[in-house]
Swiss-Prot record:
Role according to the record: Specifically methylates position 2 of adenine 2503 in 23S rRNA and position 2 of adenine 37 in tRNAs. m2A2503 modification seems to play a crucial role in the proofreading step occurring at the peptidyl transferase center and thus would serve to optimize ribosomal fidelity.
GO CC field: cytoplasm
Primary localization: cytoplasm
UniProt-listed GO biological process terms: rRNA base methylation; tRNA methylation
GO terms for MF: 4 iron, 4 sulfur cluster binding; metal ion binding; rRNA (adenine(2503)-C2-)-methyltransferase activity; rRNA binding; tRNA (adenine(37)-C2)-methyltransferase activity; tRNA binding
Protein name: Dual-specificity RNA methyltransferase RlmN
Domain of life per record: Bacteria
Lineage, broadest ranks: Bacteria, Pseudomonadati, Pseudomonadota, Betaproteobacteria, Burkholderiales
Main EC class the enzyme belongs to: transferase
Location of the active site: 95 (proton acceptor), 354 (s-methylcysteine intermediate)
Domain Radical SAM core: 101-349
Family matches, as Gene3D superfamilies: 1.10.150.530, Aldolase class I
Cofactor note: Binds 1 [4Fe-4S] cluster. The cluster is coordinated with 3 cysteines and an exchangeable S-adenosyl-L-methionine.
Family classification: Belongs to the radical SAM superfamily. RlmN family.
Length: 383
């Protein structure tokens, strides 16, 4: 007779924990207790869960774990940005980045080891695609960062000190903008985001959790039906021929389909606009004429633009737009009444800036070298 495999409780959202407790003959309130211990009190084992019956603790010891991925490295930039390299096994690693600001703290979370989309301006895509992360590996990034940051600030709201478990929240915003395309790992990403939003876990609002996608249209519709959080779309070009080159996924879901999906999403979104991200590439997509094209393409979608100065890496063959050209491009958009920001480069001294999340990981995975070819874009069907 073989024993059942152990369950990593980090892989379970509230509904999953209720179902798991039911399988042990336990009532739903036990699931809520477990969730608080794991996500609010940072419990690493079951012995310290003092309000659980001893019999339940013994059951859990033999059947469940709270397994976090290991930390390979932890670097802090001169601007306060902090980057962790996270070991997810089999020579794969992902990166998690915390960006402190005066009124908020934003955590950039990865969803895949590598990325299959292979955008030309993104160093992560150049390492190829290895695998999807599990729900536990995704929410584990938030859990790890929140409690590491609390410890570094001397903040402890845990139960052992008489706190309510929530303490002084350090991570106030989460952006699913790290390594990978979140909508190509839908079944793991959505439960992780449910935990981010759950008041019994991290208690973030839907406006403070943003998912960034390169434009996986069927899954955008599915996300709108299941869990409409704030949405950012990696646009980067005002025409299909150029976007086909910069974002290969565009060949499957061209701009017309993408804009229609954005309109549908806005009907259920927690914000009344879509954020369009646009990487500024010298002589490629940064002319004033292209800014006007961009306005025409997005005219039916309430939006704001986030212009991102390109962070160069050797394999790209691309150059960052000059600051004065970025300013001229932005002015065209603003003159049309569209809110436009230019992203401030953060953490570039530790390779934590936008598009740089491959650095040390690329050397660890060497995926392109092992496969000898770029990963193919995953076929996606809405279910």
């Amino acid at each position: 007779m073989t024993s059942s495999p152990t369950v990593n409780l980090l892989d379970l959202d509230a509904q999953g924990l209720v179902a798991y407790c039911d399988s042990l003959g336990e009532k739903p309130f036990r699931a809520r207790q477990l969730q608080r211990w794991i996500h609010q009190y940072n419990a690493a084992d079951f012995d310290g869960m003092t309000d659980l019956a001893k019999s339940l603790r013994e059951k859990l010891k033999g059947r469940a774990t709270i397994s976090m991925p290991g930390i390979v490295s932890d670097h802090i930039s001169t601007d306060g940005t902090r980057k962790w390299l996270i070991d997810v096994g089999n020579s794969n690693a992902v990166e998690t980045v915390y960006i402190p600001e005066e009124t908020r703290g934003t955590l950039c979370v990865s969803s895949q080891a590598g990325c299959a989309v292979n955008c030309r301006f993104c160093s992560t895509g150049k390492q190829g695609f290895s695998r999807n992360l599990t729900t536990g590996e995704i929410i584990g990034q938030l859990r790890m960062a929140e409690f590491a940051l609390r410890a570094s600030r001397g903040v402890d709201g845990g139960r052992a000190t008489g706190g309510d478990g929530k303490g002084e929240r350090v991570v106030t915003n989460v952006v699913m903008m790290g390594m990978g395309e979140p909508l190509l790992n839908y079944d793991a990403v959505v439960p992780a985001m449910r935990l981010m939003l759950d008041d019994n876990a991290y208690g973030l609002s839907r406006r403070r959790v943003t998912l960034s996608t390169s434009g996986v249209v069927p899954m955008m519709d599915r996300l709108g039906a299941d869990l409409p959080v704030a949405l950012a779309v990696s646009l980067h070009a005002p025409s299909d021929p150029l976007r086909d080159m910069l974002v290969p996924l565009n060949k499957k879901y061209p701009l017309r389909e993408l804009m229609a999906a954005c309109q549908r999403y806005l009907k259920v979104a927690p914000r009344d606009f879509i954020t369009f991200e646009y990487c500024m590439l010298d002589g490629v997509n940064d002319s004033e004429a292209q800014a006007r094209e961009l306005l025409a393409v997005t005219r039916d979608v309430p939006c704001k633009f986030n212009l991102i100065p390109f962070n160069p890496f050797p394999e790209s063959g691309l150059i960052r737009s000059k600051p004065e050209q970025i300013k001229r491009f932005a002015q065209v958009l603003m003159d049309a009444g569209v809110i436009t920001t230019v992203r401030k480069t953060r953490g570039d001294d530790i390779d934590a800036a936008c598009g740089q999340l491959a650095g040390a990981v690329k050397d660890r995975t060497r995926l392109a070298e092992r496969t000898g070819k770029a990963a193919k874009i995953i076929e996606v069907r809405a279910v």
